[in-house]
């Protein structure tokens, strides 16, 4: 429960609360629709996050987490145990709801109570209602406890976040009354209720049999149990012997489940795979394919489960090694030793959150992990042979159980096109296949092309299915985990941070190989001759390839990764026309500066984006409703007046607003602003759709776009350029260097260095607001902020807040940047207090003294196309480069590469 975010309600004015996790309280007001003005979702935050620094931090209070916490605490370590729910135990050991009393608690309830009591006696500190929203380092975790932001800095970190159920994506799985087996079991076991008098249970695994048995014993009619595995026959005797020998009590439970169901007249239909659910007169009808032919079972509720997916997000965010397990839908598992040790010395991962194995394995490995953490911290802890023996027995039992319930791998090709795969964004299997037909060839590009996996559940319900459709078979193929790992109230994280004058940067040559680099599918080496080689197939490279191909040139464009899937689709989609407060000194640089000269290009480029939209047949969500740049003081307002004057000199439609005019136009702003500059031509668009359209148009124009093709060597041979790639040699009459952060590296190979460095920048997205909060793009005149509301209602926050490179060289978020960016946004738009942040991401950007555009006089035939504000300016720069290629004037002289030779 709690993974799909389908049950959102408004509670006491607080929008988008998960009903399945909210306890009913007297006087509570619950509404289905979001309010026009949501109440703040968290208490007023402190100025900075409080810190906790235990010896051992355990995330997750299920069997594994409880066992690890007890072992470490009894060995003398200070232990804090975090769990999102209001009581320890997890799904397997969940307690009975407080509204009920035990008549005769079963073994699971008794075991849960004993573990909780032992943990309390050992001094374990429980923090319930705690969500770890980001893992930035083994000793830096962002944690929300009771709505307050905290930072955990443990000496050892034990991850035991559990698993979520493997969804069954079939037509009708989103209908009311269809739920996961675990959700229905929570209702039945902890709350003693059922969503219907008659229930059908389907899928794969012993949990379905246990639920059916518990429902029968609770007085619920079970219409049938449909098990996807074939009926165990005589040839399963080896597995039966192993089960009985390794865990006779659990084996007996299985026998008892079947006996109870048989006595109740409940049919267990083996080899039955769910196909679809349809509304019926008296509830729902589940259709399935079975060995004896199609089956249809009608009930008031349907429980579906095809296994489990580990919650590996925190471990992946930290950089722990993972493997892909090709079973069922397929899943990522954290690679660990018997004691939960990962590839990171400070991090241990245990339980179903690391590898699916069940409660017995979780308990044994949890104890070994807790002892290992204590031993690392200098505690005298002897080896626990009994736990190692218990682990071996449990692993043997689980392996036999999996063989008994083994089913064929998930075949994504059987999904009907109208099957909803991504519930949050309502993306169908057909939409995913259509995106693949248009060139999306990875999970990442499918996600960007369709928005699958971008909703509140952050891919928990659809990522494995999308990965199957995309053919993702290794850990790097999966979408990178992002902070926050679950939706978090924006207000809770809004904490002021120091701002900066110069962004941190680095040489792009030090960057790692791209996840898609060199995956050319084993293409044979070949030689290609072309008129123009474009190096870099981001938005700028694709725009240039399209423009040059339309001129009749034979164009080949290369990208080290997947075309357009780097910084171009990691940006916020702003269409900037006015001068930026944080990109340059603006008016102080004077009318001859590069920053001022670029003013002539912005409006023209926005118009060209509209032309691209018309040609593509899509609107691309282009909106030009103006852009505000806010001033807090009269001094800042005077500086904006100078900026507006310069912009007008260059033909930009810009004006200065006093406080009264500003608040008349933007009543949603926080009070206290002195005024603003308003540029009528600014706006926004959808960068994901824009990039997809541009890629298609470039190919339609005749450009050859190659992904996963890094340039490994580049030289001049007589009158042509020779580019070496893993797939062969390309000889080109001319070269355009549009490699973004890598452009300096490409230029240096030809003996023509240019001053290009790389920087990591952040973007944040909130959930959709229930109402329109703002129409224009908003910038802050003295702080790092860009803010806008997309067509779907979500807010997009930018402002060049920095990220960093992780140990593997991949860009990632910084906790301080997330908190600081949200603080500035809240100071401008108080309504953000009622919204959750659903994701934050980073992308590489260039850090340059100014746009570097046009022919390089040092190397005939070499052209550079490197700029900030690349999304806005890509179409106009493409036209200017195409003009230069045909011998015309090209980009303004102030952007010439020769202007920067002394800075290289």
List PLM regions with ranges.
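Dinucleotide-binding Rossmann-like beta1-alpha1 core, especially the glycine-rich loop
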Residues: 140-142, 150, 574-661, 784
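C-terminal catalytic lobe of FAD-dependent flavoproteins
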Residues: 265-326, 344, 398-465, 469-478, ...
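Helical element adjacent to the flavin cofactor pocket in flavoenzyme catalytic cores
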Residues: 111-126, 132, 251-268, 676-733
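FAD-binding core/adjacent interface of flavoenzyme oxidoreductases
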Residues: 13-57, 112-198, 218, 285-296, ...
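Active-site lid/adjacent beta-loop-alpha segment flanking the redox-cofactor pocket in flavoenzymes
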Residues: 349, 353, 357, 361, ...
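Helix-loop-beta segment of a Rossmann-like dinucleotide-binding subdomain
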Residues: 94-108, 237-246, 446, 618-629, ...
């Amino acid at each position: 429960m709690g993974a799909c975010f389908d049950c959102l309600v408004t509670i006491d004015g607080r929008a988008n609360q998960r009903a399945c996790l909210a306890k009913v309280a007297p006087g509570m007001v619950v509404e289905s629709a979001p309010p026009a003005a949501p109440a703040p979702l968290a208490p007023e935050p402190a100025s900075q996050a409080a810190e906790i620094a235990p010896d051992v931090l355990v995330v997750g209070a299920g069997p594994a987490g409880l066992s690890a916490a007890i072992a470490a605490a009894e060995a003398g370590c200070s232990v804090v145990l975090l769990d999102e729910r209001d009581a320890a135990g997890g799904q397997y050991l969940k307690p009975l709801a407080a509204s009920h009393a035990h008549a005769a608690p079963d073994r699971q309830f008794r075991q849960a109570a004993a573990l909780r009591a032992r943990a309390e006696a050992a001094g374990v500190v429980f923090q319930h209602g705690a969500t770890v929203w980001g893992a930035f380092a083994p000793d830096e975790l962002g944690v929300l406890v009771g709505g307050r932001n905290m930072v955990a800095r443990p000496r050892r970190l034990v991850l035991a976040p559990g698993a979520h159920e493997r969804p069954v994506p079939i037509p009708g799985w989103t209908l009311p009354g269809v739920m996961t087996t675990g959700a229905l079991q929570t209702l039945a076991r902890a709350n003693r209720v059922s969503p219907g008098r008659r229930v059908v249970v389907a899928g794969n695994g012993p949990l379905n049999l246990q639920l059916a048995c518990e429902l029968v014993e609770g007085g619920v009619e079970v219409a049938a149990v449909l098990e996807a595995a074939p009926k165990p026959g005589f040839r399963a005797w080896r597995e039966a012997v192993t089960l009985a020998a390794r865990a006779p009590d659990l084996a007996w439970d299985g026998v008892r489940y079947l006996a109870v169901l048989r006595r109740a007249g409940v049919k267990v239909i083996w080899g039955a795979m769910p196909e679809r659910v349809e509304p019926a007169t008296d509830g729902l009808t589940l259709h399935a394919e079975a060995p004896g032919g199609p089956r249809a079972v009608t009930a008031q509720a349907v429980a579906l489960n095809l296994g489990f997916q580990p919650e590996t997000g925190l471990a992946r965010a930290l950089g722990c090694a993972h493997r892909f397990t090709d079973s069922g839908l397929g899943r990522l598992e954290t690679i660990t030793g018997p004691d939960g040790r990962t590839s990171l010395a400070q991090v241990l991962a245990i339980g179903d959150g690391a590898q699916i194995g069940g409660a017995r394995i979780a308990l044994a490995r949890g104890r070994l992990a807790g002892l290992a953490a204590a031993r690392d911290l200098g505690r005298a802890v002897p080896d626990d042979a009994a736990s190692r023996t218990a682990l071996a027995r449990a692993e043997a039992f689980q392996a036999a159980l999996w063989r008994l319930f083994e089913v064929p791998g998930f075949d994504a090709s059987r999904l009907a096109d109208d099957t909803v795969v991504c519930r949050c964004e309502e993306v169908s299997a057909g939409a995913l296949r259509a995106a693949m037909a248009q060139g999306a060839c990875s999970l990442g590009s499918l996600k960007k092309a369709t928005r699958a996996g971008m909703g509140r559940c952050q891919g928990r319900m659809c990522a494995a299915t999308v990965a199957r459709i995309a053919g993702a078979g290794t850990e790097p193929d999966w979408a990178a985990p992002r902070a926050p790992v679950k939706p978090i109230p924006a207000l809770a994280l809004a904490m002021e941070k120091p701002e900066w004058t110069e962004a941190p940067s680095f040489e792009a040559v030090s960057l790692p190989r791209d996840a898609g680099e060199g995956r050319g599918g084993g293409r044979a080496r070949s030689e290609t001759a072309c008129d123009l080689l474009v190096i870099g197939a981001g938005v700028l490279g694709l725009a240039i390839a399209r423009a040059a191909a339309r001129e009749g040139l034979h164009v080949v464009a290369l990208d080290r990764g997947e075309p357009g899937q780097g910084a171009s689709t990691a940006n916020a989609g702003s269409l900037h026309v006015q001068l930026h407060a944080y990109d340059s000194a603006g008016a102080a640089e004077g009318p001859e500066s590069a920053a001022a000269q670029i003013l002539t290009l912005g409006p023209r480029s926005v118009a060209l984006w509209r032309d691209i939209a018309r040609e593509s047949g899509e609107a691309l969500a282009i909106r030009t409703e103006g852009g505000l740049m806010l001033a807090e003081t009269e001094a800042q307002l005077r500086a904006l007046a100078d900026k507006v004057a310069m912009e007008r000199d260059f033909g930009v439609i810009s004006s200065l607003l006093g406080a009264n005019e500003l608040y008349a136009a933007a009543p949603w702003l926080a009070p206290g602003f002195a005024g603003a500059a308003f540029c009528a031509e600014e706006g926004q668009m959808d960068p994901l759709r824009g990039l997809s359209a541009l890629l298609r148009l470039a190919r339609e124009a005749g450009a050859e776009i190659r992904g996963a093709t890094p340039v490994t060597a580049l030289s001049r041979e007589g009158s042509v350029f020779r580019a070496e790639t893993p797939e062969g040699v390309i000889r080109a009459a001319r070269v355009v260097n549009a490699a973004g952060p890598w452009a300096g590296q490409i230029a240096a190979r030809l003996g023509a260095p240019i001053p290009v460095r790389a920087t990591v920048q952040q973007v944040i997205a909130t959930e959709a607001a229930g109402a329109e909060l703002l129409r224009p793009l908003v910038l802050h005149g003295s702080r790092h902020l860009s803010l806008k509301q997309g067509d779907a209602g979500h807010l997009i926050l930018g402002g060049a807040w920095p990220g960093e490179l992780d140990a593997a060289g991949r860009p990632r978020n910084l906790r301080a940047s997330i908190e600081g960016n949200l603080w500035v946004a809240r100071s401008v738009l108080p309504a953000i207090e009622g919204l959750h942040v659903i994701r934050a991401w980073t992308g590489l950007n260039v850090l340059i003294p100014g746009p570097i555009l046009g022919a390089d006089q040092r190397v005939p035939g070499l052209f550079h196309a490197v700029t900030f504000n690349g999304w806005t300016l890509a179409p106009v720069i493409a036209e200017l480069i195409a003009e230069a290629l045909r011998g015309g004037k090209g980009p303004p002289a102030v952007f010439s590469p020769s202007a920067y030779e002394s800075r290289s």
